[in-house]
Amino acid sequence: MAWTAPKITEVPLGAEINSYVCGQKK
């Protein structure tokens, strides 16, 4: 469980930051 927990939170966070940065550039 300890191994999957960080991944579950990391992926959506990374996607959110990615889309946010992309939106800021445009």
From Swiss-Prot:
Organism field: Gluconacetobacter diazotrophicus (strain ATCC 49037 / DSM 5601 / CCUG 37298 / CIP 103539 / LMG 7603 / PAl5)
Keyword Oxidoreductase: no
Any Pfam family hit: PqqA
Pyrroloquinoline quinone (Glu-Tyr) cross-link, renumbered residues: 16-20
Functional note: Required for coenzyme pyrroloquinoline quinone (PQQ) biosynthesis. PQQ is probably formed by cross-linking a specific glutamate to a specific tyrosine residue and excising these residues from the peptide.
Protein family: Belongs to the PqqA family.
Gene Ontology biological-process entries: pyrroloquinoline quinone biosynthetic process
InterPro entries attached to this UniProt entry: PQQ_synth_PqqA
Gene it is expressed from: pqqA
Protein name: Coenzyme PQQ synthesis protein A
Pathway: Cofactor biosynthesis; pyrroloquinoline quinone biosynthesis
Entry annotated with the keyword Glycosyltransferase: no
Keywords per UniProt: PQQ biosynthesis
